[in-house]
A protein has these predicted regions:
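Glycine-rich beta-strand-centered segment in the early N-terminal region that forms part
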Residues: 1-29
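Hydrophobic beta-strand signal
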Residues: 21-23, 101, 206, 231
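NAD(P)H dinucleotide-binding glycine-rich loop of Rossmann-like/cofactor-binding domains
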Residues: 22-97
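Short helix-loop-beta connector
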Residues: 92-100, 176, 201
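Conserved S-adenosyl-L-methionine
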Residues: 96, 118-128, 201-202, 226
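Adenosine-nucleotide cofactor-binding segment
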Residues: 118-190
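Glycine-rich phosphate-binding loop and adjacent beta-alpha segment
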Residues: 186-250
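C-terminal hydrophobic helical "lid"/dimerization subdomain
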Residues: 237-294
């Protein structure tokens, strides 16, 4: 909520004191003081807190007029990956894929991309969701299938740290059919190998995170002798807010059902196993000469 606007402020002049707003600029780049953290949502990667932020004129701010209250977490999660969602949506509408595969670290984010893929070629897209086997301890396959509904034709749990063995499971399950597009949301080393292994020649692999081994994926595609279009993480998009609102409006029933599943799941107990896999080989958090913060 806006507490004060200085007379010299030349940013979004439509905003006024008392407005509820969403900041599309990463908070890591702004002066921030936290008084208290009241709750942590492990499923959506969000915290509720009290404090203050100083927003400059260059900061991208929008007035929150949609999905207030408990539903705001859906919108905030979509806006967290705003640029990637918008870019992948444009690419898929251009491609009109018949088969997409999503390597998902988080069911919510995976659902966003499944919806985007489905909307890119309505009624003609076969969405496959792949998750690391460590998640099978907290998410029942049948419950995930029920939550995703028509957004996921099939769901697989495989060991992403052994990508060649995982690819054999997928080849067998999909009768040898490769995907037109693969969206890699996972940071576990090996996911990028699996992505390039199961994408078609002249297909596309989308990398959506800071730690998804993008450059290694380029080398792997070359080793497989495939011509692959690599779509990378993107940043701020002017149309991010209306795009996210439209996306969430089309996903509310599925998100409500996914919430019920995540509320039953013990998300904390899976973190140790996932982090162990993330730290394999290059344990110092250094990947392809880029250092990123955890």
């Amino acid at each position: 909520t806006i507490q004060e606007i200085t007379p010299e402020f030349k940013g979004n002049t439509e905003l006024k004191e008392g407005d509820d707003i969403i900041c599309l600029t990463p908070l890591a780049g702004l002066p921030l003081f936290l008084e208290d953290i009241t709750s942590v949502d492990m499923g959506y990667g969000q915290i509720k807190c009290r404090g203050y932020v100083i927003c400059f004129e260059s900061v991208q701010l929008v007035k929150q007029e949609d999905f207030k209250g408990e539903e705001s977490k859906y919108l905030l999660r979509a806006l967290e990956v705003e640029g990637s969602l918008c870019r992948v949506s444009r690419e898929l509408k251009r491609m009109k894929p018949s088969k997409s595969l999503i390597i998902g670290a988080n069911p919510v984010e995976a659902m966003f991309y499944a919806k985007i893929a489905s909307d890119s070629n309505v009624g003609s897209v076969d969405n496959i969701l792949v998750m690391d086997s460590s998640y099978s301890h907290i998410y029942e396959k049948e419950s995930l299938e029920k939550a995703f509904g028509k957004l996921a034709a099939r769901i697989y749990f495989v060991d992403l740290s052994t990508p060649m063995e995982a690819s054999q499971i997928l080849f067998a399950g999909e009768n040898g059919q490769l995907a037109d597009v693969v969206v890699n949301l996972e940071s576990i080393e090996g996911a990028e190998t699996l992505a390039n292994c199961i994408v078609k020649d002249n297909g596309m692999v989308c990398y959506t995170g800071m730690s998804d081994n993008y450059t290694k994926g380029l080398l792997i595609a070359d080793c497989f002798g495939k011509e692959v279009n690599h779509c990378t993480l993107d940043g701020y998009e002017k149309e991010a807010y209306p795009f996210a609102v439209s996306l969430i409006n089309g996903l509310l029933p599925e998100l409500f059902m996914l919430d019920k599943l995540m509320n039953r799941a013990d998300l904390k107990k899976n973190f140790a196993e996932v982090k162990r896999k993330e730290r394999t080989k290059n344990a110092a958090r250094k990947i392809d000469d880029f250092i990123y913060m955890s």
